[in-house]
């Protein structure tokens, strides 16, 4: 009895000239290898491998052999591209990650490097997809590379990515600084008055410390200034005048006191202090006179 997992169909159009013996091929099925020798088959007929699980394929294999005696060929697979060559190949059945209920498996055919020179025209990798006869949706051929790992980045790429990240960080910081500058209130520029404007303003301030609205408008028009500029200048000038006036008043009061002392007219607040000083001076002079008199009397007594 043949293996339940495999069945080979012979094409009715096979000729005796295209027969080539196949060598023993190794089959790797989920870590289990079986070596089987196949009889001579026609290259025009397509060799098929139906992959499945024992619980699904046992029934399928028995039905297939029974139907083979009554019917010639019900399902015909596509022919291989090279029909006139003998292939010595290893069939590898990759371990599928699909659940047992899945009925389709991908088979990848990789020709050996030691084959005949005519195999150079054949593609390097032939992929075929076999599915169970019960499935109604055909599937395409797909071969996935074994190496799914990511390639390591070169130092140049790492440096380039780090440089782009630093540039993005610097641009973000610059944008933040610009936003903070925009949000902050701009500082007003200080008005620079000319000498002629200052002279006119000083002359007006000497006559009037406070301006009326009409007079302020006239001065602003004459001096080519705004009313706000004239108003602010007069406010600052009044504050300065008050500070100078306070200092001048103190200096004038001190000068006046000195003049009064020189003239002999003292202020009532200074009389008490000056009187006490004069009395102290007179007392000292009297004490000195008494001491002198006592000295003279003692000298006369010794004589």
Curated annotation (Swiss-Prot):
Residues 111-136 have a biased composition (Low complexity). It is found in: Nucleus; Nucleus speckle. It holds the Pfam family Homeodomain. Residues 63-81 have a biased composition (Basic residues). Residues 157-170, 182-191, 289-303 have a biased composition (Basic and acidic residues). Keywords: Activator, Developmental protein, DNA-binding, Homeobox, Nucleus, Transcription, Transcription regulation. GO terms for cellular component: cytoplasm; nuclear speck; nucleus. Residues 63-191, 279-303 are annotated as: Disordered. Residues 86-100 have a biased composition (Polar residues). Interacts with RNF10. Interacts with TCF15. This is Homeobox protein MOX-2.
